[in-house]
Amino acid sequence: GCHISRALLKKFHDPEHIYYAEYEQLLQIKGIGPKRAKLIYNTKCLSQAEKIMENCHKHKIKIMTINDDIYPKKAKMFDDMPIIMYYKGTPTPDVMNQKSVAIVGARRCSRQARQTAIDLAVALSDKGITIVSGMAKGIDSYAQTACLKNEGYTIAVLGNGLDICYPTEHEKLMDQIEKNGMLLSEYEPGIKPQKVYFPRRNRIIAALSDEIIVVEAKKGSGALITAQYGENYHRKVIRLM
């Protein structure tokens, strides 16, 4: 998990030193017992990592680690953030650390909510604020499309590998975000969308954002999960409808 990965990186500083760590060294890390230390020590197979790298190269996907300048500082402080993320697009350290606001909400939304999402995205991007969302149907896509039309910067956090477009009808939007923003995922190429991945994805949306605006959402929705993560991360959360 992310907690163990961060503990390993904190102790050994880089993946190469983790790879060559002795069993006794692994045991010294808090949260790693004998069983887990043995698993880490015995699972030293580079073939899987090489396959991921090949797939990334094939699909023009880049990798950021928690030690990179483009990894957002506002997200680094949380222990449940991945130490590695995959991305496509045009991030810079300045862009990744400028003010950002998440606009999230229902897939099936009212006309009023749709217009609110569009108006918010335009007003915020006018101020140079990054729009963060999940490229889902409804509020997400309305906000991100409006941001791009207004020549703003947007980050789409996906719940699958970046070689897959989900939902499939958002191929054009995905291409536009890659050219004028950033596509981001903790999942390597080839990982298909699964229901369990989207709530986890929402924690990254929350961590990347200084504020979270829920335009319209039903009980138990992904947007409210994002809002809950935001509150846990001490972000400003605004619920409009």
Predicted regions span which residues?
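Glycine-biased, small-residue-rich flexible motifs in mid-sequence functional cores and linkers
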Residues: 65-241
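Short, positively charged patches
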Residues: 1-122
